[in-house]
């Protein structure tokens, strides 16, 4: 029977048990780094970046990234030296390079600032500093001069060469200073040591280029080139075009000094710095020797970082060949006196994460019968591997260093899984699901074919058991809820026929016109009626900005000039509408690539004359973009930015009838999905879908009434198809069987069943009498994926909550006291990101958790809570009608706001990393 590969099907177990299944999947890849490194080598180049960030986030939360990197480095040398030669090791965008880079940027951020901040700031602030040594770029470099006479240019070049030499020496002296090296995170030093150990054994002539390439290319150089994203500069300091070029030249010199490669070839103009490289060769050798030493453990290097007990650690000792000595000339095994204490600059967890206890390798019970079996087998296989390694020194290093059979106590595991970000799990699920056929063909089948090889038999057994269990977990989970992969810009077909220059000109002209028309039709930027002070008002609708807007920057610039240029000679207002905005990876990349260019192109009047910037319905993306733009704007401009959490608050500045926001933005409800619901009779109804911590709300966007609420555990099955925008759900129908319960307070919206069944849905039937199936038609495939992900995330968090001793309600009956003392009965209902204020089933107002400034319990009455919204001048008095629920409301709101803020911080941090990588 043929399998329909286009069909997507999920059963209730997938999301209700996602906590357990995702937990076991991450448990497997963390404890069996041999399998993980084997899988990593199956990843296509298109997935390398995503998988690297994903795996670093998951492993770092468990403090287990280092053993994986060790395996990957050893495997890189084992497989490539003989097959492809020394020149292929750790080159390009390999998985080991990407994981190394992501990891050291994560844990070394504070250390980078400690080492480089003062020097980089000095370079950026020195407006007279001239380091350009490329004769072809002198005219561009000196923006205030038109041209140079040859004689003057030669003098300038000599002066610049001398300055570049001096500044580069200052940087190198600072980086290699032993008192500075002491503060380097030991994790970074360990990676350098793994690289050096492998180089000594397999490629001794490449030791300096490999270690230098790691420490400079992956760590220091990116920070020097993009200091605004590495926080080497304060927020009010922005590098000029000249300063950026100076930093690039410095990074080039430092990079070549670190790997000992002399300039020449395509960069002939840099050969004047070869004396610098030669003169610092001994300094760099001493530096490499120093950073590759563990200051705490002489005999069991890095064992504590790898999660291995020192008493049982087997240390790999490599004897240098006759032609290889240590960098200080005294031999590779010479050690300095151990330095007590670790680096105070180490950052061990992603932004917003609480550090998890290290996952222990000690033997302990682990959840799941299959896991216990696997762990026991893995322990036996590990012992066999150790024996084989002791008896056969020629075995692969990866066998020695593979971390298997990591059993985890339930307490530490619960803490760990709570700190893993759900999007990382979705990405992990998507990537493993995409490569499940390769897991079968390349790992399971290959190991079976090699089963007769005695040297590999034990390792094969471990990898096979792990791989088989991964396939079983993927089957239980079903497809990843993140099915949509965003399309990359299509490359030009090499087979296309060449066009003549005349055709090219016509094509370029028509392409420009087509882009211009596309920009005009999208109406992502337009002018609205003036504000109350008769100032021009422009609207930027972020939801309408697509990645293709940036495909050709010239039409974009022309369009912005056309819309704004006439009016920006005098003060004006900019309204940035973030309603319904989703920033895709393609759009993020485009924004981070082109915004700096646009900031440089537009004249000073655009910045000077802007009076106010209103951010309507702000989000994590807003904060990240504002942070990103801070490098190109002034502190004065940032003071002009105002967050608007309710679009009607714009009426303080613009007459309400003149607010030109789209109607969909005025209907905006935080993280909702505007869909079409099709009932069993085929009737189509517009709906907003919104999630609470345990249910799905169906909201009529016209009346703002909650038509019904479906618990996540009432959804039995979900189906869709690849490329489809439809979601089909089968429901258990429990709500129909328990209609009487819905009138009671059980944490779900109390809906009376006394409606007249003769009325249709628009007259108040509220979707009560529907069949046990429903269909949603989304606007696009990505939106469908987001709904699926929210269902999985809700189920995941319900699984975490079920382990908690206390489950807080999400619905509260209250009396809201308005400004004039009037009492109003209301229901407060918490969604995943907002507080709904309900009059029966009608949503009177919604406040994002981001818009709540403070929550305070009344000191004299535990049933009174005071709420302060950022959009309102004073606190609101809230009286809980059920005795004792005041403290619960305070606790649940505080917890929800903190979790939401943590999520925002993590998203913002990820966007900042994207911005940094966009310029590497």
From Swiss-Prot:
Annotated SMART domains: RasGAP (SM00323)
Gene ablation phenotype (knockout): Show spatially and temporally unregulated Ras activity causing cytokinesis and chemotaxis defects.
Annotated positions for site Arginine finger: 91
InterPro entries, per database record: CRAL-TRIO_dom, CRAL-TRIO_dom_sf, Ras_GTPase, RasGAP_dom, Rho_GTPase_activation_prot
PROSITE patterns attached to this UniProt entry: CRAL_TRIO, RAS_GTPASE_ACTIV_2
Record-level GO cellular component terms: cytoplasmic side of plasma membrane
Role: Regulator of the GTPase activity of Ras, mainly RasG and RasB.
Protein name: Neurofibromin-A
Record organism: Dictyostelium discoideum (Social amoeba)
Underlying gene: nfaA
